[in-house]
Amino acid sequence: MGRGAKRLLGIGLLAVVCASGFYLWSHFVYADKEVERLTAEDGTRLKFRTEGEVIQIYEDGAWQPLFVQGVNLGATVPGHFPGEFPIARDDYMRWFAQIKEMGANVIRVYTRHQPVFYSSLVEFNNKHADDPLYFIQGIWSPEEQLIEKRDAYDEEITAAFLAEIEKDVKAVYGDLEEPESPGKSSGSYRTNAGQYLLAWSIGTEWDPEMVANTNELHADKKAFAGEYFAASEGATAFEAWLARMLDRAAATEIAYGWQHPMTFTNWVTTDVLSHPEEPLFTEDMVSVDATHVRPVDWNAGYFASYHAYPYYPDFFRVGDKDGRTDTYAAYLRRLKAYHKDIPLMVTEYGVPSSAGVSHEGPLGRSQGGHNEAEQGEIDADMTKMIRGEGYAGAILFMWQDEWFKKTWNTMPMELPEDRRAYWLNVLTNEKQFGLLGMYPGLEDKLRIDGDGRDWDELDETEKTELAASVPGVESIYAAHDEAYVYLSIRLDRDFDPDKETLHIGADTLPGGNRHGKELPGVTLNEGLETLVTIGKDDETGVRIAANYDMEKRLYGFVYGMIDMSEAELADDSGLFNEWRLPLSLKMEPPDTKTAHPYENVVVGGLRRGTNSPASPAFDSLAMWQYEGGFIELRVPWILLGIADPSSLQAVSYEMPDKAFKTETIAGIRFVPWIVDKQTNAVSGLNAEEAGGRPYDLSQAPLYAWDGWETVAYTERLKTGYFMMQNAYREIGGKPKTGG
């Protein structure tokens, strides 16, 4: 054997030794950092169990009652979709520390994460052995197939779910090799995180039509008796199927010498209560009852869990006749009363800090329309409310903002759908539930506060001067990031909204308004799609040309739920409508139990204030401010008709197949002018010398930008983080009753 061959052999042996050492280290990494646990006579280990109506933790040689307080943790960051699993060790380690500092004792994950999640959690807990951070492992059901086939007993669905259950249990115990598969986690799971597990959570929110159809198709399958879990008397076919899934999870885990509490996911739509006020049949058509499943030989126990938000379904609002009833507290009380002698946990609740709204909730607990302070106050109040009603735990939705998310009233305009993760639509509330904000690229560089010094400090490549031939306007600059277009306007005098109004028209496509009351005595040779108006606080906002109005076109022209006049349909109507989003669609029998009107909300208003967290007047929804003669604002992309700024797509006037489409644009042509409120005289648009001729819009500067495939974002703990921290400290991990 030559010297080179010997050298290679030596390197190979060293690699094997190192690999073996890593394997042993990862499997027995906590050998000297073991959590206190109870070991039964048969050697089975328990750290958590259910007892009566509470969760208990084994500490100081005894079982102690524990209120489970924590957050749901997503699987992605901006610029990525969940199936890409982009979160790195450093991200997890940073987040775990922040979550622990907040006072949470648990995190919940919906699905199996990449191996780095489990190795990072074990590494973190080794540094906090006296008070580790526990986790609840969710096991994702074949959601799309369940909805499509509407039959849980379908052989492919059942086989896929059973296989996923086994894989997830093995992953937690560091015993899984999973090959790469699009949209799914994969890799070598070699870190045993089992001792930090608090519970297993099986499944996702169940489609009611699937549940009802499963029960109807398999009425003869109401019984299931497994070794560890069984269906109780009165169970439905779907509940028996769930008992089988729980039994498989238990059977897989017991092989690793551990038992942990079990639950399955449920939500208000398939709860056990009757809601006669609910207008939609599907929101109150079938129940999935946790009390119809029981542990047979599972000492760790079993509990019920629900996703419960204060604004959905509609009965929360419809049942609030006087606008003062706390329908959420009443619901929690009724749900708790039903679940006797079993712990009950809310595993999702919360409100987002978003400009957009998609459901209105009683007492201001709507799905959106809150700044970060309001979000935190509501989240903290609900946390204490859940605990006060005797629940075993409350797990907030959620830890981090998720840009890839969508919601029903903005998704028709977010096109292409597969690029949602590359920009932040602040009108899509689902994107901003987090306590950890994920902010666009200029968040820390441009503060809306009326101080232009941060504009001066911007690199020349980050801003563009827009030549403005408007008397009294010294300069206009534009900038952008993944969420907003920013504009700064410097006047040669102090801005006085009592005496003047500043308008900035935006042209992106052929068509739109070439005249209007906002253009007194002036016409344009090309139309405006949207109009930004800056004046008094109640005047400032973005409006949209009537024939471009997306709400009117979709819910008026296509669906006929609201009126769209002939005048609004015409090109160059001269009408600029309020920018609105629907909150509730028009519903009538026999499609619904009761008639329900179409409802909407104005989202085009721009709130004056400062978005600087350092300011006592901090308002995360502040969109504009002025000081003296300096005005600055930020405008959400969608309010300008931009469907995807990362690929320069604007919502088109055309609606083939009665749905929105997009057109690629060169940029946005901004057209500024000032109107004197006393004389109605126009400054700008060459009004003084036009002589009745239309203003040539091509004279206006075009703000152009390059598309992008990667995003720049910054993290910051929201105000709500600190409010939740106070709530957790007040609760102290102790349930209302000790069980």
Residue ranges and their predicted role:
Residues 262, 275-362:
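Glycoside hydrolase catalytic-domain groove-lining segments
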Residues 88-166, 245-258, 263:
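Aromatic-lined substrate-binding rim segments of carbohydrate-active enzymes
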Residues 508-531, 641-739:
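Acidic/polar low-complexity flexible segments
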Residues 357-364, 369, 374, 385-463, ...:
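Aromatic-rich peripheral "rim/lid" segments of glycoside hydrolase catalytic domains that contact
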Residues 465-587, 647, 651-678:
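Surface-exposed, glycine/proline- and aromatic-rich loop segments on solvent-exposed faces
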Residues 32-126:
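Active-site-adjacent substrate/metal-binding segments within catalytic domains
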Residues 450, 484-492, 629-637:
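Short, well-ordered beta-strand segments enriched in hydrophobic/aromatic residues
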Residues 141-147, 151-154, 164-235, 257-268:
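Active-site groove signature of glycoside hydrolases
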